[in-house]
Amino acid sequence: MVKLTHLLARAWLVPLAYGASQSLLSTTAPSQPQFTIPASADVGAQLIANIDDPQAADAQSVCPGYKASKVQHNSRGFTASLQLAGRPCNVYGTDVESLTLSVEYQDSDRLNIQILPTHVDSTNASWYFLSENLVPRPKASLNASVSQSDLFVSWSNEPSFNFKVIRKATGDALFSTEGTVLVYENQFIEFVTALPEEYNLYGLGEHITQFRLQRNANLTIYPSDDGTPIDQNLYGQHPFYLDTRYYKGDRQNGSYIPVKSSEADASQDYISLSHGVFLRNSHGLEILLRSQKLIWRTLGGGIDLTFYSGPAPADVTRQYLTSTVGLPAMQQYNTLGFHQCRWGYNNWSDLADVVANFEKFEIPLEYIWTDIDYMHGYRNFDNDQHRFSYSEGDEFLSKLHESGRYYVPIVDAALYIPNPENASDAYATYDRGAADDVFLKNPDGSLYIGAVWPGYTVFPDWHHPKAVDFWANELVIWSKKVAFDGVWYDMSEVSSFCVGSCGTGNLTLNPAHPSFLLPGEPGDIIYDYPEAFNITNATEAASASAGASSQAAATATTTSTSVSYLRTTPTPGVRNVEHPPYVINHDQEGHDLSVHAVSPNATHVDGVEEYDVHGLYGHQGLNATYQGLLEVWSHKRRPFIIGRSTFAGSGKWAGHWGGDNYSKWWSMYYSISQALSFSLFGIPMFGADTCGFNGNSDEELCNRWMQLSAFFPFYRNHNELSTIPQEPYRWASVIEATKSAMRIRYAILPYFYTLFDLAHTTGSTVMRALSWEFPNDPTLAAVETQFMVGPAIMVVPVLEPLVNTVKGVFPGVGHGEVWYDWYTQAAVDAKPGVNTTISAPLGHIPVYVRGGNILPMQEPALTTREARQTPWALLAALGSNGTASGQLYLDDGESIYPNATLHVDFTASRSSLRSSAQGRWKERNPLANVTVLGVNKEPSAVTLNGQAVFPGSVTYNSTSQVLFVGGLQNLTKGGAWAENWVLEW
């Protein structure tokens, strides 16, 4: 391995404390921070989470539930009145005495159940009702009826109201509240559903956790700016899950015997049935997975459940996206290239150097990004004119665009509010927003003023009718100064570095330094490295350890071991939104909802408190940014947005990155399950900060991670301020590993793009779990260390240090599936259900092609623009039955409504391959070659539409059974898909 000390000797490597001195406080003189917000400003109340509180009441034990009456049936379902079945328990709020139940069979595969208060008015409607202007509800189809539904609802009043959602085909209860009580209060709702003994649930995000949810998990859902802690609430809110159940039986005769995945035998035949459940709610949530039950708890809102009957996992995802939250946005072709970013690029020259180094080492680069370093005083839409001047930027970006590359800057959710006593501190963006009065308010009507990077800040009120136009206009104004190609929308949970409106009365202290040390400042030098760094870099590790110990000793503080917890006693008819009586296990200090966030009492223009819509802030900001980019590009170019906080449906506007992860092997490991979850949520454009964000990376970790992320839809390297540089050209072995994986990625970009078109038009997934692609194999239910890219490619990455092999399973082997090694093109010899040991030395990532698929490919290049100008190739991997199929979608790669498109279908048999194209997009590049895997005998001749292919261009390997047909350019000069053709051998 190349040691760190050797790397530091290389002239083009930036020193360890990369950019710290310039980037931390580098702003124009009038905006130099002189005041540091005290750390106490972000200290909230000390609360104890209900699940950890020995004094907490169990609502199931003390609440009476409800009784149903006045049932009225209609063609699409029924309604009923629910009345409290006893004395109010008021355990975590005020009981709602009268509820209305609505059951609607919305389509053959979709059912909706609503339970909402019967009596509300304008003063409390937002406590329970989520406006359809914010989150649309799924609509019933014209032909929907009870008789046509896959599902059926039954209910009972014994001992209190409960209901079941039953799959007609099996009689299984997919959702059952039998034996439990419904608790419905103004700040607390609880309902419980039964689950099978050994259940397989996926989703319920956002969390860093196992792909198949643990059966004793406590899942808090409340968007939070808190890095990427394991098993805690993160940035987004996705109260949707997939439930897969396995059976031994026969669909034809209706025989279904439940099977536990842990007891399944890979040599046996099974079937599976999956369904999905979505809770349309934007309040804080807690979902407790227990033995044979799931407990839903919310801090408000209503019960608005939609059930999707599947029965395959792919069906569930399609039903959820097409009917309820919206189909994913179609991405620009170029966004599938490689993206490079870091917090600490100090000026345009730094960016130019990075681009030059990618070219020097011939590593593909599509997008260069900047973090908050470019900003004037960390203000949105305003460049630092000393380091990121508009004139220098225009020159740099012109050259960047000429080279076929692009630029994305970060934009934060908060906006600086200038110092009223400093005329030089003027900020036009704030002035325009204030003129339109589009910022969040305190309950008394004054501005809510929090604190983020620039100091004291205000926050757009997305409920204000002028807010989206204001935001869009700021993007348009800025775009005339900086020719950016997308937006990275951050800090949108929405984050604030203090509790409450801490800037009220303190604006004369602006600009202000955050209440915590920034990376690289004295006391926060980054000494952390990956887990195995001490083994492979002993000298450097010892030095880092000594530095860390010294820093820890210098900054050590004493803490009290005695903690007094604040507990809120419910007041009848009154809500306490800052400290609700029920305390969710929120992963901020003290579990206080106001810590490191805009307070729940911040008020929107329509009177709605942030408490009721907290989960939507980032979602609405993504919509505003999407609308803004439409204006920037005159509704011609697809907006490219990567956002941090997301909600159900955010995928129709943006992609998502995994947040502030760590340069650790465990962080790389969990990136797969996080990506698969976001596939489920309908946000396929997902990627993790490759090589890790927090802490220093090292050669081995970055080597493996650059290869893993090459198969994620969004592929970006990013790290934090003051850590060592980790661009892929920093280590010799990483250069080669990156180029090796990128050669595959860039070759299959047409396949990736086709997958995105299918996701955008049908609701299919791009990155897939093995259990979704092979739904009838229970042994795959928990697999999270390998994954599929579409239906054709399987990736088996190395996820631990100091190894040269990896274990991988080959699904379907023994049941007709054939797998081919990408590199050797030979069929894999594997046994059913066996974790096969695969050679994987550093720099090699095992990749396999599934038999039965045809991949359209082009030659790799340094940019996607260059790659799109290269000849075509096809890789046809024959299945065990000697057939294969595939498809290709093409357009101009960026238009929202392309003037011309092309769809190509490919089919292959044991002796031929056919191409059939439809559409008006003119693809001029010829077909160069076709490779067919699994050809069991050497052909005597090869023809294309009856014309003989020159024998010298045809090779056959009898050992690997690979047929290669080259020399096709002259036969396809008009374009590979200009006419339909058949290749015969």
UniProtKB/Swiss-Prot annotation:
Record-level Gene Ontology MF annotations: alpha-1,4-glucosidase activity; carbohydrate binding
Enzyme nomenclature, EC number: 3.2.1.20
Class of enzymatic activity (EC top level): hydrolase
PROSITE patterns in UniProt: GLYCOSYL_HYDROL_F31_1, GLYCOSYL_HYDROL_F31_2
Modification comment: The O-linked saccharide is not identified, but is probably mannose.
Gene3D superfamilies per UniProt: Glycosidases, glycosyl hydrolase (family 31), Golgi alpha-mannosidase II
Catalysis: reaction(s): Hydrolysis of terminal, non-reducing (1->4)-linked alpha-D-glucose residues with release of alpha-D-glucose
Catalytic residue positions: 490, 493, 660
UniProt keyword annotation of Transcription regulation present: no
InterPro entries the record matches: Gal_mutarotase_sf_dom, Glyco_hydro_31_AS, Glyco_hydro_31_C, Glyco_hydro_31_CS, Glyco_hydro_31_N_dom, Glyco_hydro_31_TIM, Glyco_hydro_b, Glycoside_hydrolase_SF
Glycosylated residues in this chain: 36, 124, 143, 218, 347, 422, 506, 534, 537, 545, 550, 559-562, 571, 601, 623, 835, 881, 895, 899, 957, 970
Signal sequence bounds: 1-25
Keywords: Glycoprotein, Glycosidase, Hydrolase, Signal
Gene Ontology BP term (one): carbohydrate metabolic process
A Pfam family assignment: Glyco_hydro_31_3rd
Family statement drawn from the similarity comment of this UniProt entry: Belongs to the glycosyl hydrolase 31 family.
Function text: Hydrolyzes malto-oligosaccharides, but has a low activity toward soluble starch.
Name of the featured protein: Alpha-glucosidase
